[in-house]
Amino acid sequence: MPVKWLLHWQPNQGSTFSSQILNEVTQSIESLNGVKEGTWKATLNYYKPMLQDQANQAEFPREFVGISLPEEPDKYYFVIRSQRIVVEADSSIQMIMESLQSYKCKLSFYFEGLEYQLGDFRLRVGKVVPTHAETIRGVVMEVEYLPISSMGMAKKLMEEFLEIWQEAMSKRSLPGKFVNKELNFEKFGLGDNYTPQHTAVGYAFFMANLMAAIQAGRG
């Protein structure tokens, strides 16, 4: 599959997320002659073990995330960051987990927005919202370079594209910027050839940062 970078919006100190940011981002894409292709949606669930016996606590991961991706609707991805494990499963695994009741979904977020084609690039821009709530907790942008699946080969082209993109965004004087956090996929046993597992790991790390930010805000 095409190489993908997952960027997240980093607001300036004191500013917050809003739908206005999404509007400005989509206008920037359209100003670069991006063609709207439709909508997209992904979901991310945050699981914790339901332990009957606390003595067994060490045998179970303390937490992990489950992710459904729009490009792989029949699959479900689990990421256990603490053990550097990423697993692809059939989407029906969610029903099995509910029946087993060994893990409980504590939090759910969905990512939804618009998808654009811009030359050889596909851009997905979306808001991050907790299920059963309207508060925007984040803004993400997926950048795919369609002709190449090798991360090493695509890196320079992706960096050049992002320079053009950041320049276009800077004209709008928004209170923040998109940030690309480079991850060490090798620690998860993933190679240079991009796969949906790479995307799942990216979302898992995004989720970890998001949860930390939410908890810091409450603190």
UniProtKB/Swiss-Prot annotation:
It holds the Pfam family Med20. InterPro entries: Mediator_Med20. It is found in: Nucleus. It comes from the Eukaryota. Its main location: nucleus. One of its GO terms (molecular function) is transcription coregulator activity. Signal peptide: none annotated. One of its GO terms (cellular component) is mediator complex. Keywords: Nucleus, Transcription, Transcription regulation. One of its GO terms (biological process) is regulation of transcription by RNA polymerase II. Belongs to the Mediator complex subunit 20 family. Component of the Mediator complex. Component of the Mediator complex, a coactivator involved in the regulated transcription of nearly all RNA polymerase II-dependent genes. Mediator functions as a bridge to convey information from gene-specific regulatory proteins to the basal RNA polymerase II transcription machinery. The Mediator complex, having a compact conformation in its free form, is recruited to promoters by direct interactions with regulatory proteins and serves for the assembly of a functional preinitiation complex with RNA polymerase II and the general transcription factors. This is Mediator of RNA polymerase II transcription subunit 20b. It comes from Arabidopsis thaliana (Mouse-ear cress). The gene is MED20B.
